[in-house]
Every structure is written in structure tokens, then in C-alpha cells.
Amino acid sequence: MASILTSISASISRGTRLRVSKIKRLRSPLALALMGLMLSFGSYRVLALEVGDVAPDFKLQGTDGKTHHLQEYLSEGAVVLAWFPKAYTSGCTIECKSLAENGHLLKPFNMHYFMASVDPLAKNKGFAKQQKADFPLLSDPEKSVAKAYGVLSPRGYAVRHTFYINAQGRIVKIDRNVRPSTSAEDMAKNLEALSIPKKETNS
């Protein structure tokens, strides 16, 4: 069975179809389950966005009671969209806390930042209130935006990826190795490295 699964994995990576004869040879439930998982991950990789791509537009409800439309924010500057798996879980709580407690590192930049998940809005509202988040958490319960960004995992939740979108609507950075405990500090460093301008201040 191992040799068959290796062949399947190679076929997926090459973007080719599985041969019917090989599928018929997979008799056990375990083999079929593994095949389904490989196919899911194969689709996930195909949909992944890359730097330079146009960021998929979105209109999502936020924990602040507003509908947030990407295109409207681009006229004002950059946008950072930080996807997280599930409200109230350990890593997501740490990430949200970092952003909530260190907003002073981010607010000087001419940009808007959000966390986003496929959780229901009511759940994210409670989570945002608990963490005293002073920025909107967006909800994508239909998972359509998560799919468009290529972050929907085979298990149905968003993976922890952060997208940096410039004012022209292009993705200029994707952080696929987010460290929850230093989310704010890392985001500020990335914004600086990307030359995202600071807001004008009255002297």
C-alpha cells in the first residue's frame, strides 16, 4: 500500500489524474481515507496565493458591527488580513492578545489590520470582547473568502496565515509562519520592511 500511496502523492504533485486502476486497487478504508486526505491537500496547494497576486476582494461582517469591504480600504492605504483557526483556542488567544496589547506598534502605519476566521460572528464577538481587541475580527462562516485566499484547511478551519496587501490591491507578503506571541511585533517589522508609509501627524 505504501508504494501505491507514494505513486498517488507523486501524481498529485504533478497535477495529473489518478489512474482508475490504481484507485480500484485501494481496498482498505485506511487507504481510501489517506487518498482523500492527499487529494484535499493537493487542492489546498493548488489554490494557494503567492506574492504578486491580486488579493481576492471581500465583504465580511466585523465584531465592531460594521461590514468591511477590502476595496474601500485600499483607497486609504494597505491592508493586513491575519487568518486564525478558531476563537478561544490557545494559539489564537495568544495572537489576539498580542495585537490587542501592542496596537501602538501598528497604528502609526497607514493601513488597516484585521484578524479573520470562519467562526460565526457571535463567537468572534465574544472572543474579541474577552481579549479587549481594539480592532475588528472578521467572520467568514460560509468559508468562501477563506477558500479564495487558499487558507481553508481540509478540517474546515482557516490556517494561520497573514496577508499583507498594498494600496494597489496586490499581495506583497504572506507570512505562513506566524508566531502568535509576537504577532504585533512581527507585523510591525514586516510593515517597516515593506516600506508601508506612516500616517501623517500634525506637528
What residue ranges belong to the model's regions?
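Short, small/polar residue-rich loop motifs at catalytic or cofactor-binding pockets
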Residues: 54, 157-159
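Sec/Tat signal peptide C-region and signal peptidase I cleavage site
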Residues: 44-48
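Short active-site neighborhood of thiol/selenol oxidoreductases, capturing the structured segment around
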Residues: 73-93
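Structural microenvironment flanking redox-active thiols in thiol-disulfide oxidoreductases
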Residues: 88, 93-131, 142-147
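N-terminal secretory signal peptides that target proteins for export/translocation
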Residues: 1-25
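Bacterial N-terminal signal peptides
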Residues: 21, 29-41
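Thiol-/selenol-based redox modules, centered on thioredoxin-like
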Residues: 159-203
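A short beta-strand-turn-helix
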Residues: 59-78
